[in-house]
C-alpha cells in the first residue's frame, strides 16, 4: 500500500543493524558529550576515537565543525534552529548506529529537553550522555576561539554560559571535569564505561 507522502517503507528488506554489527565485530552505541564551549568535549572525543580505533573498533565523530559546515549549514543560532540542529544530528547519528558504527557526538546541547529529544530519537538504550563538567571559569580562561571575550563584549548574543543558560544534565552516564582530570584519565574512565558495551564477546 502507498504510504502518505509517497514513501514506501523498505526496512523489512534491508540488512539489519545486527548484520552490520556482526560484520564489524562490535556493538554500536551513541556517546553524547555535552558541556560548555571550551570544556574539552571535542578534545576528549578525538582522543577516545583514537583509542577505540587502536582496538579495531569503527567510530564516527560528529561535532559543530563537520555538521555546521555541511548538513546544518542553513541553520543559525535562534532557539528554533538550535533545536533543529540537534534533531538532525540525532537522526544522522541513528543512521550511523543502524550501520553498526560507534557514534561520538560533541555538542554544547545546553538544556535537558534538547538532550532528551536526542535520546528519544536515538534510543535511550543506546544513548550514553557524558557531561564534560569543566567550570565556566576554566572554559573562559582557555577561550581558544576567543568566543567568551566576544560574548562578554556583547558581540555574540545568546552565548551559552554568558548570556544563555546551560542546564546541568540530571543523570549523565559519566561526568568529566577536565580542570581536574588529565586527557588520559578522562579517556580511561570513558573506556571503562564504553568497552563492555561495544565489544562483541
From Swiss-Prot:
CDD domains: APSK (cd02027). Catalyzes the synthesis of activated sulfate. This is Adenylyl-sulfate kinase. ATP binds at residues 35-42. Gene3D superfamilies: P-loop containing nucleotide triphosphate hydrolases. The active site is at 109 (phosphoserine intermediate). GO terms for molecular function: adenylylsulfate kinase activity; ATP binding. It catalyses: adenosine 5'-phosphosulfate + ATP = 3'-phosphoadenylyl sulfate + ADP + H(+). The keyword Transferase applies. NCBIfam families: apsK, PRK03846.1. Pathway: Sulfur metabolism; hydrogen sulfide biosynthesis; sulfite from sulfate: step 2/3. It holds the Pfam family APS_kinase. It comes from the Bacteria. Its EC number is 2.7.1.25. The lineage of its organism: Bacteria, Pseudomonadati, Bacteroidota, Bacteroidia, Bacteroidales. Belongs to the APS kinase family. Keywords: ATP-binding, Kinase, Nucleotide-binding, Phosphoprotein, Transferase. It comes from Bacteroides thetaiotaomicron (strain ATCC 29148 / DSM 2079 / JCM 5827 / CCUG 10774 / NCTC 10582 / VPI-5482 / E50). GO terms for biological process: hydrogen sulfide biosynthetic process; sulfate assimilation.
Amino acid at each position: 500500500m502507498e504510504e502518505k507522502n509517497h514513501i514506501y517503507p523498505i526496512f523489512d528488506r534491508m540488512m539489519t543493524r545486527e548484520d552490520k554489527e556482526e560484520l564489524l565485530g562490535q556493538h554500536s552505541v551513541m556517546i553524547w558529550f555535552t558541556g560548555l564551549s571550551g570544556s574539552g568535549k571535542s578534545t576528549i572525543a578525538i582522543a577516545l576515537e583514537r583509542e577505540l580505533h587502536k582496538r579495531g573498533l569503527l567510530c564516527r565523530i560528529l561535532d559543530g565543525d563537520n555538521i555546521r559546515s555541511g548538513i546544518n549549514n542553513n541553520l543559525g543560532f535562534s532557539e528554533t534552529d538550535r533545536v533543529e540542529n540537534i534533531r538532525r544530528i540525532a537522526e544522522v547519528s541513528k543512521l550511523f548506529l543502524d550501520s553498526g558504527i560507534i557514534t561520538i557526538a560533541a555538542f554544547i546541547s545546553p538544556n535537558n529537553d534538547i538532550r532528551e529529544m536526542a535520546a528519544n530519537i536515538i534510543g535511550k538504550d543506546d544513548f550514553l550522555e557524558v557531561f564534560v563538567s569543566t567550570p565556566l571559569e576554566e572554559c573562559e580562561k582557555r577561550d581558544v576561539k576567543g568566543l567568551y571575550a566576544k560574548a562578554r563584549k556583547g558581540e555574540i548574543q545568546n552565548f551559552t554560559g554568558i548570556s544563555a543558560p546551560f542546564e546541568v544534565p540530571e543523570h549523565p552516564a559519566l561526568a568529566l571535569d577536565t580542570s581536574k582530570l588529565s586527557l588520559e584519565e578522562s579517556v580511561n574512565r570513558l573506556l571503562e564505561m564504553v568497552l563492555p558495551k561495544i565489544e562483541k564477546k
